[in-house]
Amino acid sequence: MSQDFSREKRLLTPRHFKAVFDSPTGKVPGKNLLLLARNNDLDHPRLGLVIGKKSVKLSVERNRLKRLMRESFRLHQDSLVGWDIVIVARKGLGDVENPELIQHFGKLWKRLARNKPVPAVKTETVGVDSPDA
């Protein structure tokens, strides 16, 4: 898998975000943030970011956080295949330094990867009502 962060690896529409918020199959709470994830049945993960002005006041800080989150996701996406992930920032996240944040995200990705979705296996059921029986 390539290490890019192309358009196909992003959650873009409100419908995509709503699907993750309404029925997350994975939740990883962290210090000053929350990771919500949902199975996506694709061969790649997708990322969405929610960083409001209420939780991180300065736009410079919000942009720094988004840049670090995208970079960390890009580097760990091989272990996150099959997830739609939304990161929700909480108060105080803007005060965390870059090295600490990078380390924190590494741990969060590992915790999420442990709950990796299992691909659906197609099986044929042969029953009494089937025409072959």
Swiss-Prot record:
EC number assigned by the record: 3.1.26.5
Secretion signal span: none
Protein's UniProt keywords contain RNA-binding: yes
Molecular function (Gene Ontology), one example: tRNA binding
Pfam families: Ribonuclease_P
Catalytic activity field: Endonucleolytic cleavage of RNA, removing 5'-extranucleotides from tRNA precursor
Protein function: RNaseP catalyzes the removal of the 5'-leader sequence from pre-tRNA to produce the mature 5'-terminus. It can also cleave other RNA substrates such as 4.5S RNA. The protein component plays an auxiliary but essential role in vivo by binding to the 5'-leader sequence and broadening the substrate specificity of the ribozyme.
Family: Belongs to the RnpA family.
The protein's name: Ribonuclease P protein component
Originating species: Pseudomonas fluorescens (strain Pf0-1)
Gene (name only): rnpA
